[in-house]
Each structure stands twice: as C-alpha cells, then as structure tokens.
Amino acid sequence: MANITSVSDKREIGINSFFSKVGFYISLLKPRVMSLSIFTSFVGMIIAPGFITIYEGALIILAISIGSGASGALNMWYERKTDLLMERTKNRVLPMGLISSNGALIYGITLSVFSIYLLYYVANFLSASILLVTILYYIFVYTIWLKKRTPQNIVIGGAAGAFPPIIGWTAVTGSISPEISLLFILIFLWTPPHFWALALYKSDDYKKAGIPMMPLVVGNKKTVSLIIAYSLTPVSYTHLRAHETVLALVC
C-alpha cells in the first residue's frame, strides 16, 4: 500500500512539475505585451480591403502572436542578468533559474522560425518578411543596440511594437498601403510616453540596471513635458486626418 501511495505521489508531483514548466515557458512570451500585438494586428486585418476565411484569420493571428511571444522570449534571454538587478523583473523565470538560459534561447529561436513560416504558408511572403524584420528589429536594434546606449531607446525601438497592424494588413492584402500608416504612427507615438511614465515610477530600478531612460538623463520635469507632448501629438494627428476626410467628403 505504501508503494502504491509513493508511486501515486510521484506521478502527481511529475504532473505538477510539467504544468509548472509549461507555465514558466508561457511567461517567457510576455502575454500582456503579446495581447497588444494580437489586438493591433487584428485591427489591421479587419480594416484591410480584402477577404480571408475565419480559419485563415485565426492562423494569421496565431502566427503573429507566436512571433511576438518569441521576441519577448529572446528579449528576456538576452536581459536575464539585467533583470536580476531590477525589482520589477527579478522574479521572472530566467533570473530565478526556473528554466535554463539555453532552453529559453532555443525556445525563442524555434518559435520565431515557426511563426514566420506559418505566416508565409497561410498568408504571403510580404507579411512573413515584415514579421521577420519586426523580430530582428526588436532584438538587435532595440534590445541589444539601443536600450543601454541612449535615452531615445524607446523612441526608435518603439517602431517594433507598431508593426503588427501592418503585418495584419499585408497578410490580407499582400501589399502595403498608406491607409495603414495612421495606425502605425499612432502606436509609434504612443509607445514612448507609456514607457517614460513607467520609468518615472521605476527610475531607481533603471538606474541600478544601467538603462539610460529619459528621467535619468533629462530629469523628471522635462520627461513629464515630453510625455504630454507625445500624448497630444497623436490626438492632433488624428483630428487633422479626420478633418481632411470630412473636407474630402464635403467637396
């Protein structure tokens, strides 16, 4: 009887360990960031002039979400030592040693390749190419090159987060059109104030990690001014475009 209980306990521990591991790898995908990519790419698909089936649409969203998650995994792999220094990130799975760094790297690369191939298979070469550029841009331009070198890191690097609606659009149409530029610009302009607000709140964290976020370089007061300016710009831009549309309809 004792042996049966022991085997049962071991099986239960093994099952719990498996699901814990799955949870750790899911957290590497940065689900909250991934949800924004899913939403904006879906909007890009919906407003695109073209027709796709629900099945195709689901696979396109799946490919984009996997690509976004793969970027997050590779980002956390590269920043695993930096994350140890920050209160906000020290409890992530890599700094805590819950999964191996090699496992995270292989996971991120595998998902990247799979997402690009899946999008190419279900949609077209152009959308798959833009997804590839987005992943490479986020990892090499933002994470590796810009993040620890300039306070403009999120201004330039934020373009990576603005690509999903273009990917969704091109997955449906097979081409890039000026119409989708509005959504790209809105997300591009929204990204810096969002991260600067976080940097104001977590400036000590960024200082310890050696990341030159805007508040550490120009001070809180100027950062707040920049946040206001960047926040008002999209409003002004959309108002202008709406005004132009009304005039075009009237005339």
Predicted regions and their residues:
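The first (N-terminal) embedded transmembrane alpha-helix
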Residues: 30-44
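Membrane-embedded alpha-helical segments that form the functional core of polytopic membrane enzymes
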Residues: 47-80, 129, 136, 140, ...
